[in-house]
Design a protein with these regions (language model features):
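Alpha-helical residues within the helix-turn-helix
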Residues: 49, 66-67
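N-terminal helix-turn-helix DNA-binding core of bacterial DNA-binding proteins
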Residues: 18-54, 76, 80-88
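Short, hydrophobic-biased segments on the C-terminal half of alpha helices
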Residues: 62-63
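N-terminal leader segment of winged-helix/HTH proteins
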Residues: 1-23, 68-70, 76, 90-91, ...
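An amphipathic, aromatic/His-enriched active-site/gating alpha helix that lines ligand/cofactor pockets
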Residues: 99
Length: 99
């Protein structure tokens, strides 16, 4: 019997570096934990109320997490919601385990 084909996320070196950089910041790590603790997409307003930073600072951190591929952003008009991309996080930890 043939081996099952593995379906997953392939990370290139650039994305691995972006993820490492994103997770190195304690605020972004906490934001990722906060988003990951929800089973449904988390609204920006809900994230904002729990973070003692300005809207601009929060926006910067969320953009870094998005650029790293760690979160999926869904925009509806001027509102945004965020979801943890568990597949990307899993692929990253698997890459680290190979070191």
């Amino acid at each position: 019997m043939a081996a099952a084909k593995r379906v997953g996320v392939e990370l290139d070196e650039e994305q691995i570096h972006l993820i490492a950089k994103a997770l190195a910041d304690p605020r972004r790590y906490e934001l990722l934990r906060q988003i990951g603790s929800c089973t449904a997409p988390m609204e920006c307003a809900d994230i904002r109320c729990c973070q003692p930073v300005s809207a601009a600072t929060l926006s910067h951190h969320m953009r870094e997490l998005e650029m790293a591929g760690l979160i999926r952003v869904t925009r509806e008009g001027k509102f945004a919601s965020y979801t943890l991309r568990r597949d990307v996080l899993k692929a990253y930890t698997e890459q680290l385990a190979k070191i």
